[in-house]
C-alpha cells in the first residue's frame, strides 16, 4: 500500500513537471521574434540585345514577382512584411544606395531588408542576385544567385517560388 502511494505521488509529480515544461515551450515559441522583412523593388538590366522592347513586361513581372514573394513569405507565418516608403519604380538598388534602403527599412520597422538584381543575358537566360541584410547590423545574412530559362510569366513564377523556399529554409537570421 505504501509503495502504491509513493508510485501515485511520483506519477503526479512527473505529470505536473511535464505540464510545466510543455507550457514553457509553448510560451518560448510564442515569444520568438518574427522576422520583419522589407522587400525593396528589384533592379532589372536587359543586355540581351533583343529587337523587341519588353521593358513594360519586365516592370510588370518584377512587381508581380515582388508581390508574390511578399505574399508567400508572409503566408508561411515565419515572416512579417514591412513596406518601404518610396516612390513607385524608385526603390531598388539601381535607384538609390543600399544605405538609403537600409535607412528606409529601419523607418518601416523592418529587421531585415531584401534587395535584388535581375540580369537578362540572352533571349532565354536570366540570372539574379538576392541579399537579405540585417538592418541593425547592416550585414548580409543570406545571399543567393539564381538563374532560370525563359522570359514569360511561368518562368518568373518558378523563380519566385524557388527564392521563397530558399529564404524560408534558411532558418538562421
Where are these regions (language model features)?
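N-terminal secretory signal peptides that target proteins for export/translocation
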Residues: 1-7
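Bacterial N-terminal signal peptides
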Residues: 11-22
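C-terminal/domain-edge helix-coil "capping" segments
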Residues: 30-47, 72-79, 102-107, 119-127, ...
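Short acidic, glycine/proline-rich loop/turn micro-motifs
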Residues: 48-54
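N-terminal, post-signal-peptide region of Sec/Tat-exported proteins
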Residues: 55-87
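Soluble non-cytosolic domains of exported or imported proteins
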Residues: 56-67, 95, 150-158
Amino acid at each position: 500500500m505504501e509503495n502504491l502511494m509513493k508510485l501515485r505521488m511520483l506519477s503526479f509529480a512527473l505529470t505536473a513537471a511535464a505540464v510545466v515544461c510543455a507550457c514553457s515551450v509553448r510560451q518560448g515559441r510564442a515569444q520568438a521574434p518574427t522576422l520583419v522583412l522589407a522587400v525593396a523593388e528589384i533592379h532589372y538590366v536587359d543586355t540581351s540585345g533583343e529587337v523587341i522592347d519588353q521593358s513594360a513586361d519586365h516592370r510588370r513581372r518584377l512587381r508581380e514577382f515582388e508581390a508574390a514573394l511578399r505574399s508567400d513569405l508572409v503566408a508561411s507565418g515565419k515572416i512579417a512584411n514591412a513596406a518601404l516608403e518610396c516612390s513607385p519604380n524608385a526603390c531598388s538598388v539601381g535607384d538609390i544606395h543600399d544605405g538609403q534602403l537600409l535607412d528606409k527599412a529601419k523607418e518601416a520597422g523592418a529587421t531585415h531588408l531584401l534587395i535584388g538584381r535581375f540580369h537578362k543575358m540572352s533571349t532565354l537566360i536570366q540570372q539574379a542576385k538576392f541579399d537579405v541584410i540585417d538592418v541593425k547590423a547592416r550585414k548580409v545574412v543570406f545571399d543567393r544567385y539564381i538563374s532560370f530559362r525563359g522570359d514569360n510569366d511561368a518562368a518568373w513564377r518558378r523563380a519566385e517560388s524557388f527564392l521563397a523556399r530558399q529564404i524560408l529554409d534558411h532558418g538562421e537570421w
